[in-house]
């Protein structure tokens, strides 16, 4: 049967230090009367050298069964963490691939936008040329309009002249009719 014996006073502590030959220890120790072994738990500054090797720990005493249970649960927890990390790694890889694909798509869209920009520039130049041509045509039309007005004035003047000539001819015809009546 194991019994837990704490250090209650300084004398016990110094006696323990003398038994171990070196090191300092604070905490408690377990004596197993069945197999005559001693186990320690507490705060160690140096490892104690006893007849049987002792692994210093900074926690309270636990049985081998409790330790194994803890180890199994810890292994399970670590396995879960590993699987979670692996799954997250796969997700990160998928997201990285998605981001790369989107980057490629963005590059393609940028190229399309640049091509559209070039086309827009060409169309703008074409529209500007057409605008200049329209202005030139307007100037020509204006000049033609002025020419037509001038020709129209000339035609009016010629029409007036022809009218006056016709009137004069009409007057001459009347006179001729009066002079030589038709037989």
Swiss-Prot record:
Signal peptide residue numbers: none
InterPro entries, per database record: DUF16
Top-level division of the source organism's lineage: Bacteria
Gene3D superfamilies per record: 6.10.250.40
SUPFAM superfamilies for this protein: MPN010-like
UniProt record similarity statement: Belongs to the UPF0134 family.
Official protein name in the record: UPF0134 protein MPN_100
């Amino acid at each position: 049967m194991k019994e837990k014996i704490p250090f209650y006073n300084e004398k016990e502590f110094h006696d323990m230090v003398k038994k171990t030959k070196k090191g300092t220890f604070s905490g408690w120790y377990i004596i197993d009367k069945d197999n005559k072994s001693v186990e320690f738990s507490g705060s160690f500054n140096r490892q104690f050298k006893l007849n049987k090797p002792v692994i210093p720990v900074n926690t309270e005493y636990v049985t081998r069964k409790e330790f194994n249970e803890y180890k199994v649960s810890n292994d399970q927890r670590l396995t879960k963490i590993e699987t979670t990390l692996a799954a997250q790694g796969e997700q990160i890889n998928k997201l990285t691939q998605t981001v790369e694909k989107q980057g490629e798509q963005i590059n393609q869209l940028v190229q399309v936008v640049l091509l559209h920009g070039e086309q827009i520039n060409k169309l703008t130049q074409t529209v500007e040329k057409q605008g200049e041509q329209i202005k030139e045509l307007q100037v020509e039309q204006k000049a033609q309009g002025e020419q037509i007005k001038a020709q129209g004035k000339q035609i009016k003047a010629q029409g007036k002249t022809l009218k006056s000539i016709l009137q004069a001819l009409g007057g001459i015809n009347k006179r001729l009719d009066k002079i030589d009546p038709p037989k």
